[in-house]
From Swiss-Prot:
Range of residues in the leader sequence: none
Subcellular location: Cytoplasm
GO biological process: methylation
HAMAP family, per the entry: Methyltr_PrmA
Protein name: Ribosomal protein L11 methyltransferase
Family statement drawn from the similarity comment of this UniProt entry: Belongs to the methyltransferase superfamily. PrmA family.
Biological role: Methylates ribosomal protein L11.
Native source species: Streptococcus pyogenes serotype M2 (strain MGAS10270)
Catalytic activity of the protein: L-lysyl-[protein] + 3 S-adenosyl-L-methionine = N(6),N(6),N(6)-trimethyl-L-lysyl-[protein] + 3 S-adenosyl-L-homocysteine + 3 H(+)
GO molecular function terms noted in the UniProt entry: protein-lysine N-methyltransferase activity
Enzyme Commission number: 2.1.1.-
InterPro entries documented for this protein: Ribosomal_L11_MeTrfase_PrmA (IPR050078), Ribosomal_PrmA_MeTrfase (IPR004498), SAM-dependent_MTases_sf (IPR029063)
Major localization class: cytoplasm
Amino acid sequence: METWQEVTVHVHRDAQEAVSHVLIETGSQGVAIADSADYIGQKDRFGELYPDVEQSDMIAITAYYPSSTNLADVIATINEQLAELASFGLQVGQVTVDSQELAEEDWADNWKKYYEPARITHNLTIVPSWTDYDASAGEKVIKLDPGMAFGTGTHPTTKMSLFALEQVLRGGETVIDVGTGSGVLSIASSLLGAKTIYAYDLDDVAVRVAQENIDLNQGTDNIHVAAGDLLKGVSQEADVIVANILADILVLLTDDAYRLVKKEGYLILSGIISEKLDMVLEAAFSAGFFLETHMVQGEWNALVFKKTDDISGVIGG
């Protein structure tokens, strides 16, 4: 019987998506994220509130590697990457890394215990692909397989992106999703009525994972996924462009975004740690955008910009 190696990284929740990406890049065959915040105020599948749990800023990200993997090399790489993330200003907390061997049948189902349906916005609920879920009237369900996902949709940056999409989409729009990762923002855009969505990611693994998640959801044939370096080479105009990536990368796409966003269209930028906020604002204002909405959750910020000549109620430009 084949055995697997389990590596658990205890890290600040602000680093969830970045660390999940690192684990996939080092060869993990799946990741699971245990975050007490996911259960605060949530109900289980039987409609009962979860019992009170101690809230902490630290989460546990568990990755699974084949037995043939040199775990010492993997852990060394993980520690190097975590140090690099910290140098970019990302809060990683007091990191600890644990490991153990796991039988194959345990690996196949062990990580699933971490996931329950999560209501993210008024209309949007993220549901693990293996869970039977009865949606209420008006509730829109996004099915995800978090086993290979770049986050599960519960990170503050993703939540704020989903809130922003819910606010600006009215139906019939063209949306561009830059750095699509798990594809969750593209799927949400489709469910919220967008006509056509173009999803790009530089990472081939993300492109594949996004397509797999899109295929789990009905009515998402209007999402087109492709490898791409931000908005380079893109000529398709859009009513909405959304990007949930690191601030240092966001500032590189604002000029191209202004070129592609239609008049009266929106640019949604998330993944911005507070100390990088001014840098992103300056880049967007320099490109010609006006700020319409600023959302904050903890140390994270999301910004909704508009391309408009009517500057009443907006800032910057």
